[in-house]
Design a protein with these regions (language model features):
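The substrate-binding groove and active-site-proximal loops of carbohydrate-active enzymes
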Residues: 35-44
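Aromatic (often tryptophan-rich) hydrophobic motifs at membrane interfaces
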Residues: 3, 32, 49-51, 55, ...
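Short catalytic-loop micro-motif centered on adjacent basic/acidic residues
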Residues: 65-67, 124-125, 236-238
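A conserved beta-strand-loop-helix scaffold within acyl/acetyltransferase catalytic domains
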Residues: 1-24, 71-76, 81-87, 96-214
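Non-catalytic accessory segments adjacent to catalytic cores
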Residues: 44-93
Length: 279
């Protein structure tokens, strides 16, 4: 916590990751698509403030490196930064731009949507009950595990504490967490779990059953979510980080995501140069 003139103006949610060295980083991995300090309204953390906070931390705990990923701004950081990702948003303004973007997606999935409606009893649920939310969670864990294994990606769901964090979403504030799904014959074939905050819809955990990929169930559900956000006068639909093709097509705004790394010890320089070679 950072105070100025005896007033709390900023909280930095940090932790130290311990491996062969100690790394100061943001809390929330692997679920934090965006990272930044929590700031008092109208207060802006400056570089000198940040340096002072780090100097005070050094007096309390030792660490070899500072490594901040997924920073959505960098005004309080020095020039030891690297643009390493992009986030995309669809802003809902009063012009026709976002309407045209959504309409293009609607036209793209029109054939698959019609085939599903003809061949199956189709249901799209944007307001599930608690029991239905549990079904969505189970579907997400099952299908996400299959997807990560299929693509040889790191499966964070194999780690109990991360899997527990997903399951705990049922217990959090219903106003801020949103569940939705697409069903055929009462069977879920695509789902999404995300967040709503300050009238922004955050598209976080989309997943679909690969056996029904030819019907584009993920895109059909996404289209319904976009239409609903537009109808409900959301400020924006945030696709968060990632350079997937569909995000590049469905946005009217993008933001640079920053990675910051610095070394505090000789051992830390080894880590620093390894990361620099990687990025």
């Amino acid at each position: 916590m950072f105070y100025k003139n005896e007033e709390l103006v900023s909280i930095l949610p940090l932790n130290i990751k311990k491996s062969f060295l100690k790394i100061l980083n943001w809390n929330g991995f692997p679920f934090s698509d965006y990272n930044q300090p929590i700031l008092k309204t109208n207060y802006h953390l400056k570089l000198n403030d940040f340096k002072f906070i780090i100097s005070q931390l050094r007096e309390i705990v030792k660490f070899d490196n500072i490594h901040f990923i997924n920073n959505i701004n960098s005004h309080y950081l020095d020039d030891t930064i690297k643009i390493n990702n992009i986030s995309y948003q669809l802003m809902f303004t009063r012009n026709e731009q976002q309407h045209n973007i959504i309409q293009k997606l609607k036209n793209k999935i029109k054939y698959e949507y019609r085939k599903l409606k003809i061949n199956y009893n189709l249901e799209i649920n944007l307001n599930p009950t608690k029991h239905e939310k549990k079904d969505i969670l189970n579907f997400f864990i099952t299908q996400k595990t299959k997807q990560l294994n299929r693509t040889n990606a790191w499966n964070y769901l194999n780690i109990n504490k991360y899997k527990k964090n997903i399951n705990n979403l049922l217990e959090y504030n219903n106003k801020n967490i949103t569940f939705s799904c697409l069903k055929i014959e009462n069977k879920i074939i695509s789902a999404h779990i995300g967040y709503i905050y300050n009238n922004v819809f955050y598209y976080i955990f989309p997943v679909y059953d690969n056996d029904y990929k030819k019907y584009s169930p993920g895109n059909i559900l996404l289209c319904k979510l976009l239409e609903n956000c537009q109808t409900e006068n959301f400020k924006s639909f945030d696709f968060t980080i990632g350079s997937e093709a569909y995000k590049r097509k469905l946005n009217n705004k993008s933001c640079e995501i920053i990675e910051y790394i610095s070394s505090e010890t000789i051992l830390g320089y080894t880590y620093y140069f390894l990361i620099k070679l990687k990025i």
